[in-house]
């Protein structure tokens, strides 16, 4: 099992191969880098940052995964160690050479695995050539066009969860605490779990989705519920063949396929018929992999 730590001082002395980056979403490119450090024969170490560096620099960034889920996904790949470094304004101002001395040298880094586009240090002035000049062995992971966290965000904002899953190597997930809602779903025969996600997490485009949660297929709604004149975004999921109280629990909802736009209906009967059709579509949906 991966050893998760917060400071380099918690790691025992060793020669290390390091994959370094934010790893938001832990997509197929990230996985390739982590597998490459595992293959070096050295202590395989992943260094990631929290909060996201661009947030520290004053930019708004919606994250694909929570830090906790990021750690879980990296752990599933199986490096020896995962170091979560706090990204601070002071760290962002380090010159590239200072960054290497402050972050990589204390780890006993011998090999750095990264994509050719990897940049670090103040103004992103550090690159792989600088790492080589500083005496580090650099292994370049081939970068596949379109495989990036930024592209995942673009696809999710467009509601293309299938395209996002192709880059991630798994379905995108929406995760959060189940909180009380309006109880309308129950009165219509389709009780839903109302999921409150962490602030700053990216939520896909409004619409109706097929997916799963707790190993049950699910029909999910993301949006403002226009049939009832809503204005606040909500994430609600009806779990097929599930009985039980989910309030107060953390629920992880996989999104497999976007079924349709959200809309208002001429009557409640028409709404119920459409929900039934959505549930049937969710029953037939195929999980992307």
State the predicted function of each range.
Residues 1-10:
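Short acidic-hydrophobic, aromatic-tinged amphipathic segments that line or gate anion-handling sites
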Residues 4-5, 82, 138:
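Generic structural signal for residues in well-ordered beta-strands
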Residues 10-72:
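N-terminal catalytic cores of NTP/NDP-binding nucleotidyl/phosphoryl-transfer enzymes
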Residues 27, 74, 112, 164, ...:
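Residue-level signal for inorganic ion chemistry
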Residues 53-134:
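N-terminal Rossmann-like or analogous alpha/beta NTP/dinucleotide-binding catalytic cores
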Residues 127, 132-224:
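Glycine-rich, Lys/Arg-enriched anion-binding loops that position phosphate/diphosphate groups
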Residues 182-289:
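Phosphate/ribose-recognition catalytic cores of enzymes acting on nucleotide-derived substrates
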């Amino acid at each position: 099992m991966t050893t998760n730590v917060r400071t380099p001082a918690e790691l025992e002395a060793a020669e290390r191969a390091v994959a370094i980056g934010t790893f938001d979403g832990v997509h197929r490119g990230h996985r390739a880098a982590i597998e490459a450090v595992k293959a070096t024969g050295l202590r395989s170490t992943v260094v990631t940052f929290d909060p996201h560096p661009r947030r520290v620099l004053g930019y708004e960034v919606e994250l694909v995964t929570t830090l906790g889920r990021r750690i879980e996904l990296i752990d599933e790949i199986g490096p020896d160690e995962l170091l979560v470094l706090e990204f601070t304004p002071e760290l962002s101002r380090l010159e590239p050479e200072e960054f290497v001395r402050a972050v990589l040298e204390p780890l006993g880094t011998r090999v750095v695995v990264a994509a050719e586009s990897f940049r670090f240090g103040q103004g992103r002035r550090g690159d792989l050539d600088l790492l080589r000049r500083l005496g580090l062995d650099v292994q370049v992971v081939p970068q596949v066009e379109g495989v990036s966290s930024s592209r995942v965000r673009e696809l999710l904002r467009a509601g293309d969860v299938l395209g996002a899953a192709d880059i991630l190597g798994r379905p995108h997930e929406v995760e959060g605490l189940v909180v009380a809602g309006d109880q309308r779903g129950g009165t219509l025969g389709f009780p839903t779990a109302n999921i409150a996600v962490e602030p700053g997490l990216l939520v896909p485009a409004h619409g109706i989705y097929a997916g799963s949660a707790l190993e049950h297929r699910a029909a999910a709604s993301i949006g403002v519920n226009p049939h009832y004149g809503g204005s606040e975004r909500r994430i609600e999921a009806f779990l097929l063949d599930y009985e039980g109280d989910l309030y107060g629990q953390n629920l992880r909802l996989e999104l497999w396929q976007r079924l349709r736009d959200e809309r208002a209906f001429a009557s409640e009967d028409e709404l119920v018929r459409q929900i039934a059709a959505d549930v049937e579509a969710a029953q037939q949906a195929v999980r992307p992999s």
